[in-house]
A protein has these predicted regions:
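Membrane-entry segments of alpha-helical transmembrane domains in multi-pass membrane proteins
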Residues: 1-10, 46-60, 100-118, 156-169, ...
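Hydrophobic alpha-helical membrane-insertion segments
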Residues: 57-77, 204-214, 410-414, 489-509, ...
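Transmembrane helix-loop-helix hairpins at membrane boundaries of multipass inner-membrane proteins
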Residues: 1-5, 9, 21-145, 219-239, ...
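Hydrophobic transmembrane alpha-helices and their helix-loop junctions in integral membrane proteins
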Residues: 125-169, 175-485, 494-496, 502
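Aromatic-capped, Gly/Pro-kinked transmembrane alpha-helices
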Residues: 88-91, 97-110, 506-542, 556-667
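Hydrophobic alpha-helical transmembrane segments of polytopic
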Residues: 4-14, 51-65, 112-119, 147-150, ...
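Membrane-interfacial, low-structure loops and terminal tails that flank and connect transmembrane helices
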Residues: 29-47, 392, 472-478, 629, ...
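Hydrophobic alpha-helical membrane-embedded segments
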Residues: 63-67, 370, 450-459, 545-571
Length: 667
């Protein structure tokens, strides 16, 4: 592949074409007093077809070019023990300062090749799904133009050969998330969610910018050649002064984009956008960027072991924290949102214990089953006439069988059931934590795996099993399967949820750990111990047993759930009654939003009000108003002497001249 720049350029062209056509068509209809986005006025079929073909086609062609580039590279890398050298293609010089230049250059290596494989594939399937899902929505052209721009930004981020260019893609996905989360701009909650995502990410992006400057200060360059310099220092056992601070700043940026620690709060609210957007953000694009950044800068983090430890603990804490919230959510998309936060915590846990390859492997497998789950939830919502409360669902397995089967496969995959993809990637993370001696982190991850299995099968049980629990409109009774444009992507994603783990089967199970060997040249690992085969198999069986226990527990409580909306499961109701305040706290998402409001937003709002009223209005405005008042008084005094009569001016001139002569004579 000699033109890597074409891969991000194609979605960019799709954005420009779709946006231009949508804008021109909207203006033409506005002249006819109909309006392209007016409720109830559908776009002409030809225009919808154009937007769909351009939107899907541009990303689909990018996927074809991606696989044309990465398949030969991957095959070549597997034949060379040390892997192929990265392919770097310079497009043009972006900035120059003395001898230093920042180029628009694209890099293909094992890490970017792995990212390209699922970003373009999953992105294409989400675009295809959107053709059916968004068919009757307003702003069809605007939607596909934003979606194409999102893909352009993400592909730029993945292929960038320098931190400055990566940051362009980084900010691009942030902008697109704001546009797409707030897609329904006539709804206040969607607008608020878009703002929340944008502002929360600015906190992380501030750290990211400082981290980029820190990298330049340490290594004299922000190109990814600094990774090789860092690798040499790892081998030499030298860590430059300030590397810990730089790692923390880059990690802050990763936390914002990948919703870790307190910066997770924007991600659940991102459900305000269309469901395919949720799938794109949560599965293949934006939220994986933080993990990718940590893996790309792995050599830098290895130089700061304390920073890695912090990454691991933040990831583990976020994983179990978000999993507990997922236990008590009733909105089908909110359950999946907190599941994403939890699974991202798993990925950061892996990176924190030095298993960067395991973290990226889980990014890879997670993209398929999480996209399948989100798109499946969209199919459920479509069938239930936009109902998202699982307490009003039930009995849908027979009415939307394709959606049910694909979501069941994806649920078993995320739960870590053998031989599905999630089993291998999750166990690679847990095994790495154990092998590196982080047994507390291992136990946290193991317990989180059980919670994941429980709340995900709770979702399946409440949605598909039991008797319909719909409202008076009887949506459950009249549910219908989605069109082929929506179900075919579900089946493809479900298939990858089964087979994607094959590239990471460990040697103890007869595999070759192909993904680990493939990524080896692109990431730097600290020393991780080896486990005895018996212990490794024992830990796998233990995690499998925990997952099965979680599934069984969810089935026992929710599998046959029926009855009124207020009491979907008597056992669950009794459990939450027994847990009392703790249960209510979990159901209310640990009151994190309220805590942030009380501890951060409200104090800053009060400080802002004080500065506005006490400083700006009183002091700054006071100075300006006092100046105006003095000028006004001076004007009034001068006006007293300004009569408009020449004789008065002549008298004043004569008296003044006489006074001047007297002063000179007396002196």
């Amino acid at each position: 592949m000699k033109q890597l720049w074409l891969i991000p350029a194609l979605p960019l062209a799709g954005f420009l074409l779709n946006g231009l056509v949508a804008l021109v068509a909207s203006s033409m209809r506005a002249e006819k007093e109909s309006g392209a986005d007016h409720p109830g006025v559908p776009l002409p079929y030809a225009q919808r077809l154009f937007h769909g073909v351009v939107g899907v086609g541009s990303v689909g062609l990018a996927a074809v070019l991606s696989f044309a580039a990465l398949v030969p590279y991957a095959l070549g890398s597997m034949q060379v023990p040390e892997g192929l050298a990265p392919i770097v293609q310079k497009v043009y010089t972006w900035m120059a300062a003395g001898d230093y230049t920042v180029d628009v250059a694209f890099r293909l290596d094992a890490l970017s090749a792995l990212m390209l494989s699922f970003v373009t594939l999953v992105g294409t399937l989400i675009h295809v799904y959107s053709v059916g899902y968004m068919q009757k929505e307003e702003g069809y052209g605007r939607y596909f133009s934003y979606l194409n721009l999102f893909m352009f930004a993400m592909l730029t981020l993945v292929l960038a050969d320098s931190l400055p260019l990566l940051f362009v893609g980084w900010e691009g996905v942030g902008l697109c998330s704001y546009l797409l989360i707030g897609y329904y701009y006539d709804k206040d909650f969607a607008v608020a969610a878009g703002k929340k995502a944008f502002i929360a990410n600015r906190v992380g992006d501030f750290g990211m910018v400082l981290g980029i400057f820190g990298v330049f200060a340490l290594f004299g360059t922000a190109d990814f050649s600094f990774v090789e310099l860092a690798k040499r220092q790892v081998l030499a056992g030298n860590a430059p002064l300030g590397v810990y601070a730089v790692c923390l700043l880059l990690f802050l940026g990763a936390c914002g984009k990948s919703a870790q620690g307190p910066l997770y709060v924007w991600l659940p609210d991102a459900m305000a956008g269309p469901t395919p957007v949720s799938a794109l953000i949560h599965a293949a694009t934006m939220v994986t960027a933080g993990v990718y950044l940590i893996a790309r800068c792995s050599a830098l983090f290895v130089l700061a072991p304390d920073a890695l430890t912090l990454v691991a603990w933040i990831g583990a804490g976020t994983a179990i924290f978000a999993a507990t919230i997922g236990l008590a959510q009733n909105d089908i998309k909110k359950v999946l949102a907190y599941s994403t936060v939890s699974q991202l915590g798993y990925m950061f846990l892996a990176c924190g214990v030095g298993a960067f390859g395991a973290g990226m492997f889980h990014v890879f497998t997670h993209s398929f089953f999480k996209a399948c789950l989100f798109l499946g939830s969209g199919s459920v919502i479509h069938a239930m006439h936009h109902e998202q409360d699982m307490r009003k669902m039930g009995g849908l397995a027979g009415r939307i069988p394709q959606t049910f089967r694909t979501m069941l496969v994806a649920t078993l995959a995320i739960a870590g059931i053998v031989p599905l993809a999630g089993f291998f990637s999750k166990d690679m993370i847990l095994g790495s934590a154990a092998a590196s001696g982080h047994w507390v982190l291992y136990l946290v991850g193991l317990f989180t795996a059980g919670l994941t299995a429980f709340y995900m099968f709770r979702l399946v049980s409440m949605t598909f099993f039991g008797a319909p629990r719909g409202d008076d409109h009887g949506h459950g009774e009249h549910a219908h399967e989605s069109p082929a444009t929506m179900t075919v992507p579900l089946w493809i994603l479900a298939a990858f949820s089964v087979v994607a783990g094959a590239v990471g089967i460990p040697a103890v199970l007869g595999g070759t750990d192909a993904v680990g060997r493939f990524l080896e040249p692109s990431v730097t690992h600290p020393p991780i111990g080896e486990m005895a085969h018996g212990l490794e198999i024992g830990l796998m069986l233990l995690s499998l047993g925990v997952a099965v226990t979680g599934l069984a527990w969810a089935w026992r409580w929710y599998g046959r759930a029926a009855g009124p909306v207020e009491a979907v499961s008597p056992q669950a109701h009794a459990f939450y009654e027994k847990t009392g305040a703790l249960g209510r706290l979990v159901a209310n998402r640990w009151n994190v939003d309220e805590g942030i409001e009380a501890l951060v937003l409200s104090p800053f709002r009060k400080i802002g009000t004080f500065l506005w009223r006490g400083f700006d209005a009183l002091f700054i405005d006071g100075i300006a108003n006092a100046s105006a008042f003095l000028v006004e008084i001076l004007g009034d005094l001068l006006r007293f002497f300004t009569t408009g009569h020449v004789r008065n001016y002549a008298l004043a001139f004569t008296l003044g001249f006489a006074a001047l002569v007297a002063y000179v004579w007396m002196s």
